[in-house]
């Protein structure tokens, strides 16, 4: 299972390091630090204690009995929405903040879309005494004002990025510029399984805890493995996080659900696995949404955290290999999933996670899941941050 990435950071034809020469030493330093930390039991002991006492792991695997009754299959929710801060993001930020410690870096920078990764970085920085600066697209700053306020409360400085499309892609560009200027003192804490090697590998290793716990929990609850696992996919850290420990279990179907926006037949979506082509984005070769001139296409999703024109190289590889199935759910369907989980279980999912929730209904309708099949949905985050967007879309004034 640990075949990939290879020593050059490739997953098949995807991955690698497409960055300015000036960044190479920092990436090599990071790779060396991680290789060393990965073999050090003390590093994992410290991280596991933080996961346990600060993040609140392990998260429960919850049997959604009302939703199950409604859909005719057994639906379990991996409750990453219960992690401190409200999403799976903290699993990774705590790990990388500890790595920054090992490298003697006292300043951390990060990009954020929905604000969840920015928030998780601000939390890890506050907990471990680091100076934190966050780059966030101006449009996202507007959409997620309360997350910006929370980051600032935790001592982080938030830079609204007004360049380009003013979303996640541009925030990443600005963060990379900052890093190039401040390599000595600064660790760039990337929030997903994207970017140049070793990031896709590092982030996967810190998010694997989701799948490890799930495997143990579902075996205990059901006496075996699930028939399917479903996770929403933007960059892909929550999906690879839950999929990874099941890759060798061929009988478990793995579904990566992308943001279909206003439909794959429009230009307003963020489904790079479904509709992208091979290209280079933010330092790695992967599936990218681009126009006929190879320019990155503007993306759209009701869920800010899925609004990204690329995807992790490992997921692109696994889809090509046929181990993971990529599909998409539209804004409208995600909204239905959002309402459905609230109504049946009293659980408010993030709009990102609502894509995965609704997809189970699609699988049942298509006959890809039979009555009584067991499916695990990675509930990657909670929806407090999305109440305003959802209310607006549902025609309710708050």
UniProtKB/Swiss-Prot annotation:
Pfam families: PALP. Its cofactor is pyridoxal 5'-phosphate. InterPro entries: Trp_synth_b_CS, Trp_synth_beta, Trp_synth_beta/beta-like, TrpB-like_PALP, TrpB-like_PALP_sf. Keywords: Amino-acid biosynthesis, Aromatic amino acid biosynthesis, Lyase, Pyridoxal phosphate, Tryptophan biosynthesis. One of its GO terms (molecular function) is tryptophan synthase activity. It comes from the Archaea. Its EC number is 4.2.1.20. It catalyses: (1S,2R)-1-C-(indol-3-yl)glycerol 3-phosphate + L-serine = D-glyceraldehyde 3-phosphate + L-tryptophan + H2O. The modification N6-(pyridoxal phosphate)lysine is found at residue 89. GO terms for cellular component: cytoplasm. Pathway: Amino-acid biosynthesis; L-tryptophan biosynthesis; L-tryptophan from chorismate: step 5/5. Tetramer of two alpha and two beta chains. Belongs to the TrpB family. The beta subunit is responsible for the synthesis of L-tryptophan from indole and L-serine. This is Tryptophan synthase beta chain. It comes from Methanopyrus kandleri (strain AV19 / DSM 6324 / JCM 9639 / NBRC 100938).
């Amino acid at each position: 299972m640990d075949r990939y990435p290879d020593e050059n950071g490739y997953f098949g034809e995807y991955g690698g390091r497409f960055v300015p020469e000036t960044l190479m030493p920092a990436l090599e330093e990071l790779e060396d630090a991680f290789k060393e930390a990965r073999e050090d039991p003390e590093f994992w002991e410290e991280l596991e204690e933080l996961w346990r006492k600060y993040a609140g792991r392990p998260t429960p695997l919850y049997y959604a009995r009302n939703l199950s009754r409604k859909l005719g299959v057994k639906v379990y929710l991996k409750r990453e929405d219960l992690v401190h801060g409200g999403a799976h993001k903290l699993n990774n930020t705590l790990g990388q903040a500890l790595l920054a410690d090992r490298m003697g870096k006292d300043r951390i920078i990060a990009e954020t879309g929905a604000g969840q990764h920015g928030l998780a970085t601000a939390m890890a920085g506050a907990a471990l005494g680091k100076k934190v600066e966050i780059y966030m697209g101006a449009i996202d700053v507007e959409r997620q004002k309360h997350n910006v306020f929370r980051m600032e409360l935790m001592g982080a400085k938030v830079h609204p990025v007004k360049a380009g499309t003013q979303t996640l892609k541009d925030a990443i560009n600005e963060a990379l510029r900052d890093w190039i200027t401040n390599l000595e003192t600064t660790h760039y804490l990337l929030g997903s399984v994207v970017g140049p090697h070793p990031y896709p590998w590092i982030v996967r290793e810190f998010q694997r805890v989701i799948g490890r716990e799930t495997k143990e929990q579902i075996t205990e609850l059901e006496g075996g493995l699930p028939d399917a696992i479903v996770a929403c996919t933007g960059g892909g850290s929550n999906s690879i996080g839950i999929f990874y420990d099941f890759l060798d279990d061929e009988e478990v179907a793995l579904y990566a659900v992308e943001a279909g926006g206003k439909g794959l037949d429009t230009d307003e979506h963020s489904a790079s696995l479904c509709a992208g082509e091979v290209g280079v984005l933010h330092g790695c070769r992967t599936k990218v949404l681009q126009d006929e001139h190879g320019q990155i296409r503007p993306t759209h999703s009701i869920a800010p955290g899925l609004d990204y024109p690329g995807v992790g190289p490992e997921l692109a590889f696994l889809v090509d290999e046929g181990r993971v199935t990529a599909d998409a759910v539209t804004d409208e369907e995600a909204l239905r999933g959002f309402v459905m989980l609230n109504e049946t279980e009293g659980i408010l999912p993030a709009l990102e996670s609502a894509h995965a929730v609704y997809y189970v209904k699609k699988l049942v309708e298509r006959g890809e899941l039979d009555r009584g099949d067991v499916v695990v949905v990675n509930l990657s985050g909670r929806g407090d941050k999305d109440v305003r967007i959802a209310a607006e879309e549902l025609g309710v004034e708050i």
